[in-house]
A protein has these predicted regions:
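Conserved phosphate/oxyanion-binding catalytic-loop motifs
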Residues: 109
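Short, conserved phosphate-binding/catalytic loop or strand-edge motifs used
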Residues: 134-138
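Short, polar/flexible loop-turn hinges at active-site or ligand-entry regions and domain interfaces
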Residues: 121-129, 146-148
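N-terminal glutamine amidotransferase
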Residues: 1-106, 139-157
Length: 157
């Protein structure tokens, strides 16, 4: 399964991301296929996504590398190591963002019935850009809220 690391500190803004990067390196064995990061500043309501040294080359041209740009004023930070099971392409990169950038999802597990859920969400008008269960989970959340978990079969964390 994948690996997730993160922290939240509402009282104090942090800028250094090296601790997050080190934590994610420690769990690299949990996900050899990719790594990704998302950091959030609750005061300014801004977010930044990062790739890492083990991210696919195509992603490195789309976002900054956490090693080369290790500073962002933030309160909340997540790192993710990906072990690809369903969609093996870079399109399954996590943290996974909604099309408008308002929702960010980190997901560890496998949704066995994601194809059935995807068909239902397609009928409701959602347009998918990947073949991964992560996007199905996010689309389900945007459609049904936390009730999406009631419809998912499989191990989810």
């Amino acid at each position: 399964m994948c690996g997730i690391a993160g922290y939240f500190n509402h009282a104090k803004t942090r800028t250094d991301l090296s601790g997050l990067y080190k934590a994610v390196r420690l769990i690299a064995h949990r996900g050899p296929d990719d790594e990704g990061y998302a950091v959030f500043n609750v005061d300014t309501q801004t977010a930044q996504k990062y790739c890492g040294p083990d991210s696919p080359a195509v992603l490195k041209s789309q976002m900054p590398d956490i090693v080369q740009h290790p500073h962002f004023a933030h309160h909340l930070a997540f790192g993710f190591r990906r072990f690809s099971i369903v969609d093996l392409s870079e399109k399954g990169h996590q943290p996974f963002w909604s099309p408008d950038g308002s929702v960010c999802l980190i997901f560890n597990g496998e949704i066995y019935n994601y194809i059935e859920l995807q068909k239902e969400l397609l009928q409701l008008g959602y347009c998918f850009t990947t073949a991964c269960d992560t996007e199905v989970l996010l689309a389900g959340y945007l459609t049904w809220g936390m009730d999406v978990l009631k419809f998912c079969n499989g191990p989810i964390a």
